[in-house]
């Protein structure tokens, strides 16, 4: 058996169906989805893993759960939760799942069941219509959902309230340009982590956290961190540079990787290199008659 060189890498792009579904969904969604920091990172190393890590770790289908819940939050235009009544096939198309009318719809149903069991959503059955999904608080405690911007304004005089309701904003182009669909769960997780790290800073701000920080703050493994950063670089959302830690000291210079988010890239349709497949050629065994 002889292994040939890997085939040329092909570009994985969102399907036309997914892009059209995102454009249709944008009529109901916010210009920028709001997501609390507490969904992405824990405030203390001894706290349980944050909801983001729990979704990814919770068995098969983690990335579908994460992408689906983020999409639910995107479509919350009001300050309080608004019920969403769309068929599972529509959500499967938005997430660009295979066979959206059958297998994809079942994957959405499985994700909804997990999200309801873990108190991120409430599902209301409706006779003759798709089930209604009611979003609950990002903490997974079953509390009623209030948009973080509105909650922060309500508790403006409370320092504790301002901290609890700190949030990042995810541009609608994350959906309409197909980035949600082409990134894996690791890629989406690291995008959210970098958004939290960046805060309101400009795109020129250098971002850095160590593998230990990925686990301590975000509950993400080194594999997830490295895979996610690699994907973000491939789609052009992140530029990574090596920067000296002590450039002015008379010591051995140590360097580390720093990352720069480029949110302007969201204005372009997403594309990521698919993993190359190895083509294996099996040599035909000679029979006794064929032998020289």
Pin down the residues of each PLM region.
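Short, Lys/Arg-enriched N-terminal segment that forms or immediately precedes the first helix
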Residues: 43-59, 168-180
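Winged helix-turn-helix DNA-binding recognition segment
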Residues: 76-131, 199-255
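Intrinsic, low-complexity N-terminal interaction/targeting segments
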Residues: 165-168, 185, 204
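Short, amphipathic alpha-helical interaction segments positioned at domain boundaries
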Residues: 137-178, 256-292
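Short boundary/linker motifs that mark transitions into or out of structured domains
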Residues: 35-43
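Eukaryotic partner-binding/assembly regions in large regulatory complexes
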Residues: 1-34, 81-152
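Detector for short helical micro-motifs
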Residues: 60-80, 182-202
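Short, low-complexity cationic-aromatic patches
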Residues: 55-65, 83-84, 103-107, 179-187, ...
């Amino acid at each position: 058996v002889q292994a040939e060189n890997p085939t040329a890498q092909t570009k994985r792009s969102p399907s036309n169906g997914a892009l059209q579904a995102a454009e249709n969904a944008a009529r109901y969604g916010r210009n920028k989805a709001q997501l609390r920091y507490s969904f992405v990172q824990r405030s203390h190393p001894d706290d349980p893993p944050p909801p983001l890590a729990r979704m990814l770790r919770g068995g098969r289908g983690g990335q579908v759960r994460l992408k689906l819940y983020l999409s639910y939050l995107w479509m919350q235009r009001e300050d309080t939760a608004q019920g969403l009544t769309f068929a599972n096939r529509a959500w499967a198309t938005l997430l660009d799942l295979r066979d959206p009318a059958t297998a994809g719809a079942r994957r959405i149903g499985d994700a909804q069941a997990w999200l309801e069991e873990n108190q991120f959503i409430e599902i209301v059955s409706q006779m003759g219509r798709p089930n209604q999904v009611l979003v609950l608080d990002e903490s997974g405690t079953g509390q009623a959902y209030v948009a973080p911007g509105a909650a922060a304004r309500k508790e403006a005089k409370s320092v504790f309230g301002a901290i609890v309701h700190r949030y990042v904003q995810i541009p609608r182009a994350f959906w309409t340009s197909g980035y949600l669909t082409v990134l894996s769960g690791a890629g989406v997780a690291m995008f959210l982590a970098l958004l939290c790290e960046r805060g309101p800073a400009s795109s020129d701000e250098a971002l850095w956290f160590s593998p230990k920080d990925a686990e301590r703050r975000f509950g993400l493994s080194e594999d997830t961190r490295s895979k996610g950063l690699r994907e973000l670089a491939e789609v052009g959302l992140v530029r990574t540079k090596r920067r000296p830690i002590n450039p002015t000291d008379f010591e051995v210079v140590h360097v580390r990787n720093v990352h720069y988010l480029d949110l302007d890239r969201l204005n372009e349709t997403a594309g990521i290199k698919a993993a190359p497949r190895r083509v294996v050629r099996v040599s035909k065994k000679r029979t006794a008659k064929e032998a020289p």
